[in-house]
A protein has these predicted regions:
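Rossmann-like dinucleotide/flavin-binding elements
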Residues: 2-58, 94-107, 111-160
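Short, conserved active-site loop motifs that form the nucleotide-linked donor/cofactor pocket
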Residues: 3, 74-76, 81, 132
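Short, hinge-like loop/turn segments at secondary-structure boundaries
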Residues: 63-66, 151-153
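Residues that recognize and position ribonucleotide moieties
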Residues: 76, 84, 101-103
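A conserved short coil-to-beta-strand element within the FAD-binding core of flavoproteins
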Residues: 79-90
Length: 160
């Protein structure tokens, strides 16, 4: 009941209840969400990330700026930890040495990552025999620049 997706957290701020927010996943989306909640809404987010560092695919300079902002906002970060379970307003996490910690959470935000979704493209190809070219997040979760290039090249292949 108190677990929502990172997309819902961005789109529906009223779904983010209370002050103590645990964000499960420290990629770009999770870090961005934490900063937004702290800076714009006065929440106290905590980030739990399984990898040793936050947003590993992020450009180094941008990641350094992001980490500085997280520190300035006093956002707690647990790296090298995995979420074991979520229940009764608490998130149980395990570090690499299997030490368990419990975090209080009024709301838990799932930012574990996203997968591409090209079900519509597949259905159109199957039903109508159309050649459908996917671009952006339905093709591969990535960066805006890649989506723009894919869109440009897809558009250039359309027959007149």
């Amino acid at each position: 009941e108190n677990v929502i997706s990172v997309l819902d957290a961005h789109r529906h701020k009223d779904m983010v209840k209370g002050e103590q927010i645990v964000i499960c996943g420290g990629g770009l989306s999770g870090c961005d969400c934490a900063l937004e909640l702290a800076m714009e809404y006065g929440k106290k987010p905590v980030i739990v990330e399984m990898m040793d560092k936050l947003a590993p695919k992020m450009i180094m300079m941008n990641r350094a700026s992001m980490q500085r902002m997280l520190k300035e906002q006093n956002i707690e970060v647990y790296t090298g930890c995995r979420v074991e379970k979520v229940e009764d307003g608490r998130v149980s996490i395990l570090d690499k040495d299997n030490n368990r910690s419990t975090l209080r959470a009024d709301t838990v935000i799932s930012a574990f990552g996203m997968r591409s979704d090209n079900l519509l493209a597949d259905a159109l190809e199957k039903k109508y025999g159309w050649r459908v070219r996917t671009v952006g997040d339905c093709n591969q979760i990535g960066r805006v620049g890649l989506a723009i290039r894919e869109g440009y090249f897809a558009g250039s292949t359309i027959d007149e």
